[in-house]
UniProtKB/Swiss-Prot annotation:
Keyword annotations of the record: Cytoplasm, Protein biosynthesis
Biological function: Responsible for the release of ribosomes from messenger RNA at the termination of protein biosynthesis. May increase the efficiency of translation by recycling ribosomes from one round of translation to another.
Location(s), subcellular: Cytoplasm
Organism: Campylobacter jejuni subsp. jejuni serotype O:6 (strain 81116 / NCTC 11828)
Coiled coil regions, renumbered to chain: none
Protein's name according to its UniProt entry: Ribosome-recycling factor
One GO BP annotation of this record: cytoplasmic translational termination
HAMAP family named in the record: RRF
CC per GO annotation: cytosol
Lineage of producing organism: Bacteria, Pseudomonadati, Campylobacterota, Epsilonproteobacteria, Campylobacterales
Pfam assignment, any one: RRF
MF term (GO), any: ribosomal large subunit binding
Family assignment from sequence similarity: Belongs to the RRF family.
């Protein structure tokens, strides 16, 4: 019974940590990352389709992303979708592909991204605390139903807190790592 609670807490906490790391990929660092385009969809025969499912998206160098559609008529649609996404660059259509040239990041942009990373970390911590609350509620229910003793409940609460502390520390480490990556010129 208790192991199920701990395993569920661990699994959910791991998902929160993975979600944080996925969120971090949307932040621009010193070099471009194609994940910055993950949220962009294009109209593909009447259906909104993720950009990476209708084109090859490559980082050709540290400041350029090249998008080559699998079908030429999509060039204009891709160009419009990127312009509408407001990611801070203007798309350049050369007839074969759409190129995005990212200027070097300013100190202010880096600091803004650090703020966003910290906010993402806080959101992940809130998620971890909610998972802890759910686990504690499950332990409390077992104790109330006399399925476990008071001593077992105390140990279970301690274990839940230990798991919470572990994942909170992992989140702090991830944020700190991302912060140093963002501030590196």
């Amino acid at each position: 019974m208790l192991n199920e609670i701990f395993n569920k807490q661990k699994t959910q906490s791991e998902k929160s940590l993975e979600a944080l790391k996925k969120d971090f990929t949307t932040l621009r660092t010193g070099k471009v990352n194609t994940h910055i385009l993950d949220h962009i969809t294009v109209d593909y025969y009447g259906t909104q389709t993720p950009l990476n499912q209708v084109a090859t998206v490559l980082a050709s160098d540290a400041s350029t992303i090249s998008i080559t559609p699998w079908e030429k008529p999509l060039l204009k649609t891709i160009e419009s979708a990127i312009a509408a996404a407001n990611i801070g660059v203007n798309p350049n259509n050369d007839g074969e592909s759409v190129k995005l040239f990212f200027p070097p990041m300013t100190r202010e942009q880096r600091e803004e991204n650090v703020k966003q990373a910290k906010a993402m970390g806080e959101k992940a911590k809130v998620s971890i605390r909610n998972i802890r609350k759910d686990a504690n509620d499950a332990v409390k229910k077992l104790e109330k139903d006399k399925a476990i003793s008071e001593d077992e409940a105390k140990k279970a609460y301690d274990e839940v807190q230990k798991l919470t502390d572990t994942y909170t520390t992992k989140i702090d480490e991830s944020v700190k790592s991302k912060e140093s990556e963002l501030l590196k010129v």
